[in-house]
From Swiss-Prot:
InterPro entries: Thiol-disulphide_isomerase_rbB (IPR014109), Thioredoxin-like_sf (IPR036249), Thioredoxin_domain (IPR013766), TraF/TrbB (IPR039555). It comes from the Bacteria. It is found in: Periplasm. Residues 37-172 form the Thioredoxin domain. This is Protein TrbB. Gene3D superfamilies: Glutaredoxin (3.40.30.10).
């Protein structure tokens, strides 16, 4: 289990070694509006701590609530894939609507209009996410940001209702081990 966590942690951070302007790319991923991030200076008499994102509660169909701030959607896409061109804008709209984060990897080195800043996928990331499933685009996973556990979501395009129904099913199957109440 700790090897899996180490690999997932490494893969989420391995994007930093992909290109020379890594810091700028990471800032663009975390700040999609292109706003530069400046480190906040703590007020006098307070200590500087890393702030945890505000909870974004999502009610599952079984009545449980899950904090979407504890999850990140990892998208594998290609700039020339017609299914990605169909699905990626849907995913981007859902991310904005529900407040979850999307980390996009590209298999062909190209983004698309929804995710133009997709990072080229390193080989170790491919091996971690696709050990026993075929490589297809688009493919999405839910990654728990606290445990780095990756849960397969979908391969192929779907509509908004289909994607959120799958998120609901996967989070119920996961049992809400982390971030659910």
């Amino acid at each position: 289990m700790s090897l899996t966590k180490s690999l997932l942690f490494t893969l989420l951070l391995s994007a930093a070694a992909v290109q020379a302007s890594t810091r700028d790319e990471i800032e663009r991923l975390w700040n999609p509006q292109g706003m530069a991030t400046q480190p906040a200076q703590p007020a006098a008499g307070t200590s500087a701590r890393t702030a945890k994102p505000a909870p974004r509660w999502f009610r599952l169909s079984n009545g449980r609530q899950v904090n979407l701030a504890d999850w990140k959607v990892v998208l594998f896409m290609q700039g020339h894939c017609p299914y990605c061109h169909q699905f990626d804008p849907v995913l981007k709209q859902l991310a904005q609507q529900y407040g979850f984060s999307v980390f996009s990897y590209t298999l062909d080195g190209q983004g698309d209009t929804a995710f133009p800043e997709a990072l080229p996928v390193p080989p170790d990331v491919m091996q971690t996410f696709f050990p026993n499933i075929p490589v297809a685009t688009p493919t999405t996973f839910l990654v728990n940001v606290n445990t780095l556990e990756a849960l397969p979501l979908l391969q192929g395009a779907t509509d908004a209702a289909g994607f959120m129904a799958r998120v609901d099913t996967v989070l119920q199957m996961y049992g809400g081990k982390k971030g659910a109440k």
